[in-house]
Amino acid sequence: MITLKQALSLSQDELETLKNEIDAKVRASDLNAYIKAPSLNGASAKGVPILIKDNISVKGWEITCSSKILKGYVAPYHASVMENLHQNSMAGFGLSNMDEFAMGSTTESSCYGITKNPRDKNRVPGGSSGGSAAAVAGGLAVAALGSDTGGSIRQPASYCGCVGLKPTYGRVSRYGLIAYCSSFDQIGPITQNVEDASILFDAISGHDNKDSTSANLKPTQTFKNLNKDKRFKIAILRDHIKDASSEVQLAYENTLKALKEMGHEIVEKKMLDSHYQISIYYIISMAEASSNLARFDGVRYGRRAQNIKDLKELYLKSRSEGFGDEVKRRIMLGNFVLSSGYYDAYYLKAQQMRLIIKEQYNKIFEEVDLIFTPVAPTSAHLFNYHASPLEMYLSDIYTIGANLSGLPALSLPVAKDPLGLPIGMQFIAKAFDEQSLLDISYALEQELDLKLD
């Protein structure tokens, strides 16, 4: 597939040809990365075609978050990132499959069916932005937008062999993103390479008055300032690597060796055990989800239950029939930790621990420029691999720290396991220092020159 950098130089006629080619490929593909052929969404604005995750509002398109309960909901307005794309010669073209309401790590909970990993169709593409990553890796999209709540851009990027960037919280407007966990959610790019990630990130970044959490900063210019010759002081967290598979640990050590040979300084640091982060993340995210999803009641918009006797039954049946099992599980757990008698024991304590984790990251960043970790404990696994929801939650163990602290992080493919599946590593940077993330990733990408195909 043509890169985003190349596509931006095409004429309008050439772009229309490209869109037709993508549409034909999607119709012929069995990956199920797109919810439907992009031409079926209706008219598309002029510009380079960008695949959009199904929780980002595109005016006039049915946006469902891959959930039955939102079937029939047509977005009445554009998300701010869509307006930004249009101002930068790009446009939405197709909606990607995802875990229902972005709650999952495998893209198996979508009401539209599973998405397959293009590297091995018997394996998951990761989640929740699995459709976006599978499409980019499978040559079905020039680039894509995803959302990252606990690793939902970076983990599928790692599983599929793409570049995935989670910007600093507040760097990219969330206006028009259907919320899962409002204090963690962030929109970001999934692309074929680091240059494309930089271009797409620059296009969607910047202050937005419609988002009260938007940082009052101008759009970034990271692509213009990409510098592969910078040298950085990089922290590693040895205690956190113990949960990774032997293949991931080998890729980690080999990448560290490459970074040292490139002239970067590596230092060891310590912070709170990553298993604490899992507990904190899921308590807070489920609590916020139970609040955010209360609006989907069968009354205001989306799917409504039929043959009901009263308002109470309408509410119960609409939500029971409309939400999938994982979403129901998180709503119930969220309501539990917010309930009288348990709020202080769970939610309040989790918020206090979140501050401690944020302070630990800030303390490390007083001495270093970047932190280097794996993205996931393993490469992409087979479908129906997890024996329990808890096992699935543990797959986020390396990615959630950046969400808890609001820091930017980037996933870069660095190696292949013995089965030929991609393995990604991530860099985490100081708040609003996406430039350093992209600089070191750009240099490492060229140094490794990894060929996945």
From Swiss-Prot:
Listed transmembrane segments: none
Single GO term (MF): glutaminyl-tRNA synthase (glutamine-hydrolyzing) activity
Residues of the active site: 53 (charge relay system), 128 (charge relay system), 152 (acyl-ester intermediate)
Keyword Ligase recorded: yes
Gene Ontology CC: one annotated term: glutamyl-tRNA(Gln) amidotransferase complex
Keyword Lyase: no
Assembly, per entry: Heterotrimer of A, B and C subunits.
Protein family per UniProt: Belongs to the amidase family. GatA subfamily.
Name of the protein: Glutamyl-tRNA(Gln) amidotransferase subunit A
UniProt source species: Helicobacter pylori (strain G27)
Gene name of the record: gatA
